UniProtKB/Swiss-Prot annotation:
This is ATP-dependent RNA helicase eIF4A. One of its GO terms (cellular component) is cytoplasm. ATP binds at A67, Q68, S69, G70, T71, G72, K73, T74. Residues 54-223 form the Helicase ATP-binding domain. It is found in: Cytoplasm. The gene is TIF1.
Length: 396
């Protein structure tokens, strides 16, 4: 993950109330062992969001940072957290929340890699693991990465001592502060020391979320990317008008007959649709995996491992996967169903071109979906073109 691989953002597209910009990691006064980890991980120069957000977080400001997927958000808060913690104190000091178990594990991997030369323990507090593991892991981990339900449960059961917490970081804040998680976030916040620093990072921050942040952030530094730049660089976006729902599968089969793709993620809106499509593709001799939130954790882990290793070429998913899973080989994302929430669109198509890798997103649109697609175009100030006849050339 070099600086060359991170999508660049024009200076004119950054809005902020903080004027310090640091263009080199060497100039951030990072601990020597952390700096070694940063370079060892493959970072060369800080991305636009890292240039602007790492320093104010380290300086203990509350920070609200908006950047699209693939811009180095995870590196931003991971580096800042590792700089702030005291490794001699064997107790949780930074709490990082993520909306899904998979994203929490991804963040944990990044933090561990960056902390390679440091005496730091990172514990993942997530569903699907035993409470015994949490009890042991939470004793001496300086950084805890977790999902809201499991973290809240552990704090209430006094397994997670929050006395030393000084940073509360929410990744994918638009999802975390949506109605499903808002109450849990508030509950966790009331159980943290009153001086706790709050950091929110996300690809989208709609107005209602910005209002919510005023309830628990103190004079935050705001670093916002203008909305009309949020569509990912390097992602070619197309649609196919399938007219009616019943024609989607035939259209998908025709598409696969005409293109050669290493790996693809196909998004559906419901578990039932995922299961139906998986069955149909399997019957058509495709090697397919599928994943959704109701699947047992162990199965989800195995499926993701198989897909990352390349033994499975097609992954069919609900929006569970649409946030932050780093699958580098994916060149094609197909929205078999348009997302019901337009803010999930950027998270879905971000799977195809993370960190500068080029990708193609193809949306299957029924006659009824045309209005929703136009809304997505308007929301992101982008254009989704009709898929051209020479589509095969994009995958050669």
């Amino acid at each position: 993950m070099s600086a060359e691989g991170v999508s660049e953002i024009e200076e004119s597209q950054i809005q902020t109330n903080y004027d310090k910009v640091v263009y080199k990691f060497d100039d951030m006064n990072l601990k020597d062992e952390l700096l070694k980890g940063v370079y060892g991980y493959g970072f060369e120069e800080p991305s636009a969001i890292q240039q602007r957000a790492i320093l104010p977080i380290v300086e203990e400001h509350d920070v609200l940072a908006q950047a699209q997927s693939g811009t180095g958000k995870t590196g931003t808060f991971s580096i800042a957290a590792l700089q702030r913690i005291d490794s001699s104190i064997k107790a949780p000091q930074a709490l990082i929340l993520a909306p899904t178990r998979e994203l929490a594990l991804q963040i944990q991997k990044v933090v561990i890699a960056l902390a390679f030369h440091m005496d730091v323990k990172v514990h993942a507090c997530i569903g699907g693991t035993s409470f015994v593991e949490d009890t042991e892991g939470l004793k001496d981990a300086q950084i805890v990465v977790g999902t809201p339900g499991r973290v809240s449960d552990n704090i209430q059961r006094h397994r997670f001592k929050t006395d030393n917490i000084k940073m509360f970081i929410l990744d994918e804040a638009d999802e975390m502060l949506s109605s499903g998680f808002r109450e849990q976030i508030y509950q966790i916040f009331t159980m943290l020391p009153p001086t706790t620093q709050v950091v929110l990072l996300s690809a989208t921050l709609p107005g209602d979320v910005l209002e919510v942040t005023t309830k628990f952030m103190r004079n935050p530094i705001r670093i916002l990317v203008k909305k009309d730049e949020l569509t990912l660089e390097g992602i070619k976006q197309f649609y196919i008008n399938v007219e009616e729902e019943q024609y989607k599968f035939d259209c998908l089969s025709d598409l696969y007959d005409s293109i050669s793709v290493t790996q693809a993620v196909i998004f559906c809106n419901t578990r039932r649709k995922v299961e139906e499509l998986t069955q149909k593709l399997t019957e058509s001799n495709f090697t397919v995996s599928s994943i959704y939130s109701d699947l047992p954790q162990q199965e989800r882990d195995v499926i993701m491992k198989e897909f990352r290793s390349g033994s499975s070429r097609i992954l069919i998913s609900t929006d569970l996967l649409a946030r932050g899973i780093d699958v580098q080989q994916v060149s094609l994302v197909i929205n078999y169903d348009l997302p019901t929430n337009k803010e999930n669109y950027i998270h879905r198509i971000g799977r195809g071109g993370r960190f500068g890798r080029k990708g193609v997103a193809i949306n299957f649109v029924t006659n009824e979906d045309v209005g929703a697609m136009r809304e997505i175009e308007k929301f992101y100030s982008t254009q989704i073109e009709e898929l051209p006849a020479d589509v095969a050339e994009m995958f050669t």
